Amino acid sequence: MSVDVTKMPKLGFGLMRLPEKNGELDLEQLCKMVDAYMASGMNYFDTAYMYCGGKSESIIKKALVERYPRDSFTLTTKLPQWMMDEGIDGRDRIFNEQLTRTGAGYFDYYLLHSVEDGANYEGYVKYDCFNWAMKKKE
């Protein structure tokens, strides 16, 4: 699969920190933000399993996935190796949980989160996550 980078938006909507109201994520405000972003011609959203205390993927389902056609936006999320408590089985558990949380059906991009020297990289190697991710791509 090749990606035509000329068609990619120049600005992504990061979901690591989101507006809150009374200690909860503010869905109404997020919907306004998503609408303004989409209306400006942008469509790339980036989230991760642990963002906003694990609630980012679920709220983007309500603010984006349930409100816009799936082919109108690009969604990226990430596999956190350090949260794969059960090892190899954790890859699929987390991936499937992310599909459920987002309701997206598929991810346009799926990243191995925080691949760096040390424990994270070693964990990705130990649990064969690089090959696993390539198979998911197919």
Regions from the PLM with identified roles:
Residues 35, 85-138:
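Glycine/proline-rich, positively charged
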